[in-house]
Amino acid sequence: MYLSSRTGSRLLFLVKASFNTFEKVATISSTLIYFVSHKLVSSRSCSHNFRNICGYIRHNCRKCIRFCFCTFSIKISLPLVIARRIEY
């Protein structure tokens, strides 16, 4: 399912996936994180606390793109957790 964001980017929600560097898809305790154009990250579940989500996003962002040291702003809007890259 695709949802349009305010910036025109898309969020993709998947039922099942494993970590894939090329597609930039990762799982976290059955919660799916999807990197779209390296700008948005979304999670279907809010079962993880703020610190864990932030750390997981940063870790996998750097894992996908090794030179990346992005800072993210996190917005929790049930049932989504959305992280936006705000700087390099």
Curated annotation (Swiss-Prot):
Leader sequence segment: none
Organism: Arabidopsis thaliana
GO biological process: defense response to fungus; killing of cells of another organism
Descriptive protein name: Putative defensin-like protein 315
SS bond list: C46-C61, C54-C68
Protein family: Belongs to the DEFL family.
Keywords of this entry: Antimicrobial, Disulfide bond, Fungicide, Plant defense
